[in-house]
């Protein structure tokens, strides 16, 4: 969002004496973010960033929302007016607010405790794939309308052998989506994919490039047999996101300095021949454990399948770095590190699972089972208590 909006939003909270503002780093604490995102779903269907959650002193959510502008703009109230209304509700109708918070918390607890009796069978998975494919944009490829995201998990599901056998039309929709994305402005000349396109035809991207998206899209391209796209993504991971000290950075910024001014996408809009004289967008150097697990697995599999041992070697180097650096003083995995300094946030269950999956793929590519040694993971030391 625009910097002016962020500034005014921060000023509104700072000037109010009725709230205690706590800012959550989503990359450091995805578990906290996920919990409050789930709670916010009780109040709005438009989930995303920025997320503002109003809680009781016990941390239970009684109201939430995403974007509120600095000044009222139909149908959205001004953020300052939202603060005033929430404060009035808490002051004059506190019992109802607390009851609402308890109801949301209880509903989420029940949903989290529900365990399906059986895993979905082949028919259920094929049915899900067909339901996704029914939303295909037949004109421009992909699914749904603007904004359009290259949802690698969706494409990966549609590419599974089961779906290709049971719902071949759905698998074909995934192949068409990848082809459309690869030929569009969503993919940069150096091979990496941007975060999303603001238009239905995959134009006008948001120019940030994420490690998670590109690592997963590498596997999508690999499974689709699109060697050119796969090679481009791998080259982007190794050439741009890899950190000199080791591991892969979290993302490359969307903005860069062009002619003395910060420009959204300005670097990427220049011809490749002109980029050599420009400073490229900065890379977020945080080496996130789970995200690196995705990259390790993707590069190991791609390198093995396409005959690129250097990619496998890069995966080995990243694995060694994460297993050595992303640890606390008790030798437990942490969420991330920056410039060789480990974060204080303990690795989540997802971090452990993604890293383990990446190490299994690395072991398969190298033939070295030491990659998946249990002593490397120390999963029982993590917050997940696996």
What are these regions (language model features)?
Residues 1, 6-10, 14-298, 302-306, ...:
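Replace the tail clause
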């Amino acid at each position: 969002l625009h910097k002016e909006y962020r500034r005014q939003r921060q000023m509104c909270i700072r000037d109010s004496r009725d709230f205690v503002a706590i800012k959550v780093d989503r990359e450091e604490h995805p578990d906290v973010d996920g919990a409050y995102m789930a709670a916010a779903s009780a109040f709005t269907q438009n989930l995303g960033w920025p997320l503002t959650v109003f809680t009781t002193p016990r941390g239970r959510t009684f109201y939430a929302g995403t974007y509120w502008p600095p000044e009222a703009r139909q149908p959205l109230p001004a953020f300052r007016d939202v603060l005033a209304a929430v404060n009035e509700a808490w002051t004059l109708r506190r019992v109802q607010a607390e009851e609402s918070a308890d109801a949301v918390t209880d509903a989420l607890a029940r949903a989290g405790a529900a365990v399906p009796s059986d895993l979905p069978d082949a028919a259920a998975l094929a049915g899900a794939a067909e339901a996704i494919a029914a939303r295909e944009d037949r004109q421009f490829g992909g699914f749904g309308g603007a904004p359009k995201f290259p949802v690698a998990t969706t494409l990966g599901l549609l590419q599974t052998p089961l779906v290709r056998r049971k719902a071949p039309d759905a698998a074909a929709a995934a192949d068409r989506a990848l082809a459309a994305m690869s030929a569009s402005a969503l993919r940069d000349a150096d091979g990496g994919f941007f975060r999303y396109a603001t238009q239905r035809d995959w134009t006008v991207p948001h120019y940030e490039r994420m490690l998670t998206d590109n690592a997963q899209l590498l596997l999508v391209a690999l499974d689709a047999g699109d060697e050119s796209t796969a090679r481009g993504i791998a080259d982007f991971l190794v050439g741009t996101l890899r950190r000199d000290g080791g591991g892969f950075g979290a993302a490359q910024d969307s903005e860069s300095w062009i002619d003395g001014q910060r420009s959204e996408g300005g670097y990427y809009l220049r011809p490749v021949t002109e980029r050599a004289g420009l400073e490229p967008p900065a890379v977020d150097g945080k080496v996130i454990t789970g995200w690196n697990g995705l990259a390790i697995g993707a590069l190991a599999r791609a390198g093995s399948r396409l005959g690129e041992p250097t990619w496998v070697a890069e995966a080995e180097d990243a694995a060694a770095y994460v297993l050595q650096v992303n640890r606390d003083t008790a030798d437990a995995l942490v969420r991330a590190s920056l410039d060789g300094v480990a974060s204080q946030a303990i690795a989540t269950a997802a971090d452990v699972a993604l890293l383990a999956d990446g190490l299994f793929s690395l072991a398969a590519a190298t033939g070295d089972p030491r990659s998946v040694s249990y002593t490397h993971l120390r999963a029982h030391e993590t917050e997940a208590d696996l």
